[in-house]
Design a protein with these regions (language model features):
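Short glycine/serine-rich donor-binding loops of glycosyltransferases
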Residues: 71, 89-93, 97, 102, ...
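Acidic, glycine-centered active-site loop in nucleotide-sugar glycosyltransferases
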Residues: 97, 114-126
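A short, well-ordered alpha-helix in the C-terminal region of glycosyltransferases
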Residues: 151-165
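Short hydrophobic beta-strand element within catalytic cores of glycosyltransferases
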Residues: 83, 99-110
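Donor-nucleotide binding loops and adjacent catalytic segments primarily
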Residues: 1-80, 114-117, 129-138
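Acidic donor-binding loop of glycosyltransferase active sites
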Residues: 60, 76-91, 98-99
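C-terminal "capping" alpha-helix adjacent to the active site of nucleotide-linked donor transferases
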Residues: 123, 127-150
Length: 183
């Protein structure tokens, strides 16, 4: 449902320092443009105070968290996720049917995050943005995702056509096969 933006920000295991540095001003600009927002932002422990102070002073509804083992709670509260481009998180978002903007870590091994972002974007599962373009393009990309209902519906439609259920069944079969071989 897109009458307001409930944005989940995930930065991977390192919580993406740049997300905590660059995103708050973009979120303030969203609020100032009269888009109703709530931010759920993963950050590092040493960023909690600064982010909390900023969001409070900007009167932005927010929840800051560090590592959590229950990310599903945040998925259920969100209608847009801004994340790094690890295969696991992008796969989870597709299976949870949540539109996303993936921002690949430019220093990832063999540039795998960039390749993941391109793959998922070409499939029509979400948008991607290079880290160097955050300041210039992220605000507009969020606004277009919010305003262009057909784009959002397209992402969700494409995500619905994808399922990893077969993967889990195959994984279960392989585990059982290995266990049976050992017995």
């Amino acid at each position: 449902k897109f009458d307001s933006l409930n944005i989940l920000v995930l930065g991977g295991s390192q919580a993406a320092r740049i997300f905590a540095e660059e995103f708050p001003q973009i979120f303030k600009k969203l609020k100032d443009s009269k888009i109703k927002i709530k931010i759920y932002q993963q950050c590092l422990n040493n960023q909690n105070k600064k982010l909390s102070q900023f969001f409070k002073s900007a009167q932005i509804d927010f929840e800051i968290f560090n590592f959590t083992s229950n990310i599903i709670d945040y998925y259920s509260k969100s209608n847009l996720v801004i994340t790094r481009s690890g295969a696991s998180v992008l796969g989870e978002l597709v299976n949870f049917k949540i539109p996303f903007i993936s921002i690949p870590l430019p220093t990832s091994a063999d540039n795998h995050q960039y390749k993941n972002a391109i793959f998922y974007s070409k499939k029509g599962y979400g948008n991607f943005l290079e880290e160097k373009d955050i300041k210039d393009k992220l605000y507009d990309l969020i606004v277009s995702t919010f305003n262009d209902k057909s784009m959002t519906k397209g992402f969700l439609s494409n995500q619905r056509q994808h399922s990893d259920k077969d993967i889990f069944e195959n994984l279960n079969y392989q585990i059982e096969r290995i266990l049976n071989e050992k017995n």
